[in-house]
């Protein structure tokens, strides 16, 4: 747009001739703003000033203001902008809404529609009035929708926050008392006593015990922590009473009308190699004693024997000291027990242990003195020795039958069986076959063809194919029932010992097995039992990373890295438990023993890889090698140790731990001497000595004592007599001693010579 020269001249002339004339200014056509001129003092100047200010809104540099006189379509958008701008000032999300509104503003660059400034201003005023009268419905609705959509999540957030606050402000209060059964980790202890882990760790740190939340502490430390926070700890006797009240090993008989007599369960106990298996071989007409590795029983073995048309179930238990848990379990499962004592060996520690188990369980028992074919004269002596264990024979006026037997000749074997049936009749053993089956797992293993399998002693009820069962953390739908003759049967009556298939995992030995109504119920109960760790898991946890009050005071910083890590594969759960029991007896103040994994099953390539990765020793016990495991071991240079006898395994682990011990020496005195004079030779101090006892040897260890305090300990480097080097000096002779690292000899120093003899390292 160009400036009109004619108009410009007319305007300038009017300014120059008459400043008060405003009419000529009105005659101007299409005035254009060039720059602002402020004139003072006259009314005409004021009018001109107002016109020029008005022209500010009409020039090409103010297109946004000119848009107010645009067509009605544009005015609608502007009216919404003005109204929405007022509404959004009071909204929390006004910035977001303002941005949306501004994005919808359209600027029209066509200036040809503006021809007259007067008409433009009038039209603009009218348009503004109309726009202000109309409510901005579309914009307000969109705003309401935005606000409405945010209300529900906000309410949910508030509800979640309030629930979190309640959970934080309402913690579980610490219990008044707790019962201790097994060692716990710091995290588990925190959950048990409802005390934060940090508080427990802080308390132990102040006691000089540094732990983490995953480390296991023994019952003494747990008791100390509980008492510090005002929580009582139940004694072992109280725990035993609670166990007896909830003992599921005892069959529950509901309806006496359905009860029938059941066969007695007889457990044979005694010291190792006293003839337990030989007795069962004679009764069962088998030869298992000669088939056993090492000549010892390492598992609980069950037999069903028929005598005089009556059934008797025998359980043969291991006699080795490592199988204490098995013997204890056998004593608790049995109706009648037989204690075997060899006539040529007498009463042994495992014999006394078996008697104590039976007396605690209040189980009637018979004493059978075996091997009388070798030594019959010792029978009376054994009877009198048993009195010290509160076992009084019928011959001496007591109630315990004592029967001399021979498994070689069969002498008095029938008398022993008759006595068993007589005791069973007196005990009135009964069960209800109409109930759901209930029993105890005697043994469990992983079968390579059938999966997890278990040997079950049925105490009450009848077990059927297809029954749903829960065994601790394991659930099962019984696929097969195998009797003692290795035959598949459809059902098993009370006092039967059968093998069952169809388990979800290998259960722990000693677990209670219960038949339930549905598969869903079995799975739910198995999940509930997961909160209480299985017997094996508890024993493994108590063995690994143990921290006790005794070890805290004896362990050194340099011993913390001395650790033997084991991966063990066994033949069954009974062996697993026995191995853990034996390993837990090892002292761990000098070397820590860590069982990384222990399970029944074959040694696999995965086990080999795990052993290689963790630098662990891979040990097998009476188990086989899976395909590919030997090749993996050769490739990864992993040595696999496979044992057949449990005490060989235990000694092998002990040797591994002892090899990590620092060498220990004992001092053996050799001789004594006394310093008579000190002289220098080539800037070296020489001690002139007289040997007062035995002799001195070159390169032997010596102690230099001054006023009964050791001032030096080391080796003799040079030993001279007059000017000659000698290897030894006998008592009564004089000699010169030189030690390069000790030059502070004084007259009157005592010298004690000794040898360091390596001691046998022990844990």
UniProtKB/Swiss-Prot annotation:
Q: Which residues form the tr-type G domain?
A: 261-429
Record's keyword annotation contains Thylakoid: no
Q: Which UniProt keywords apply?
A: Chloroplast, GTP-binding, Initiation factor, Nucleotide-binding, Plastid, Protein biosynthesis
Domain of life (superkingdom): Eukaryota
Q: Name one GO molecular function term.
A: translation initiation factor activity
Could you name the Gene Ontology cellular component terms for this entry? chloroplast; cytosol
Q: Basic residues compositional bias: what residue ranges?
A: 93-104
**Basic and acidic residues bias (residue ranges):** 73-92
- Protein biosynthesis among the record's keywords? yes
Where does the protein end up?
Plastid, Chloroplast
InterPro entries the record matches: EF-G-like_DII, IF2_II, IF2_N, P-loop_NTPase, Small_GTP-bd, T_Tr_GTP-bd_dom, TF_IF2_bacterial-like, TIF_IF2
Residues reported to bind GTP:
270-277, 316-320, 370-373
Location (main, coarse):
plastid
* Cross-referenced Pfam families: EF-G_D2, GTP_EFTU, IF-2, IF2_N
Q: Where is this region: Disordered?
A: 1-22, 52-122, 149-168
Which CDD domains does this UniProt record tie to the protein? Answer: IF2_eIF5B, IF2_mtIF2_II, mtIF2_IVc
Q: Where is the composition biased (Low complexity)?
A: 13-22
Q: NCBIfam families, from UniProt?
A: IF-2 (TIGR00487), small_GTP (TIGR00231)
Q: What PANTHER family is this protein classified in? A: TR-TYPE G DOMAIN-CONTAINING PROTEIN, TRANSLATION INITIATION FACTOR IF-2-RELATED
Q: What does this protein do?
A: One of the essential components for the initiation of protein synthesis. Protects formylmethionyl-tRNA from spontaneous hydrolysis and promotes its binding to the 30S ribosomal subunits. Also involved in the hydrolysis of GTP during the formation of the 70S ribosomal complex.
Q: What protein family is recorded?
A: Belongs to the TRAFAC class translation factor GTPase superfamily. Classic translation factor GTPase family. IF-2 subfamily.
UniProt name for this protein? Translation initiation factor IF-2, chloroplastic
